């Protein structure tokens, strides 16, 4: 579900803004899109989705945009959902170039992987997302 559609209280709005700021800390040239899907995508209520667009194709990160999906568990007892995992996809329309998921081995796969420094920064983004209070792990 689009990050912009997931804001139901101040705490979630703060965590969504913090997620965007955290990503841009490591990739300052990226612009954030809080609504990467054309529709509300109601069937994907177990994710909070962002897209980060670069000013052109980046040979260092091997993509033009990154789709960031936070897999969440909504618990009515908590105002902020629990983070279950993170999926990032490096994209060049119309195809995926690489993917990393924090579920399992945290292994990056794909046909065109980012350079080592950018790859390390992507993993740092994931680690720091787990540190946000959005996460109850």
Task: For every predicted segment, state its role.
Residues 1-51:
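Charge-rich, low-complexity N-terminal segments
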Residues 30-85:
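Amphipathic, interaction-prone secondary-structure segments
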Residues 67, 84-90, 120-128:
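Low-complexity, flexible helical/coil segments
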Residues 89-112:
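Short acidic, glycine/tyrosine-flanked loop/strand segments centered on an H-E-D-like triad
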Residues 106-128:
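Well-ordered alpha/beta subsegment
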Residues 135-137:
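Conserved small/polar residues in nucleotide/adenosyl-binding loops
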């Amino acid at each position: 579900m689009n990050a912009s559609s997931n804001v139901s209280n101040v705490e979630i709005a703060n965590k969504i803004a913090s997620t965007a700021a955290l990503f841009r800390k490591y990739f300052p040239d990226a612009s954030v899109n809080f609504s990467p899907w054309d529709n509300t995508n109601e069937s994907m209520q177990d994710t909070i989705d962002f897209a980060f667009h670069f000013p052109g194709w980046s040979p260092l990160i091997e993509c033009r945009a990154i789709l960031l999906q936070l897999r969440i568990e909504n618990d009515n007892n908590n105002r902020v959902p629990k983070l279950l995992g993170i999926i990032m996809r490096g994209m060049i329309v119309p195809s995926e170039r690489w993917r990393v998921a924090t579920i399992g081995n945290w292994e990056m796969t794909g046909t065109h992987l980012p350079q080592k420094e950018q790859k390390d920064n992507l993993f740092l983004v994931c680690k720091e997302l787990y540190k946000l209070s959005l996460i109850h792990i």
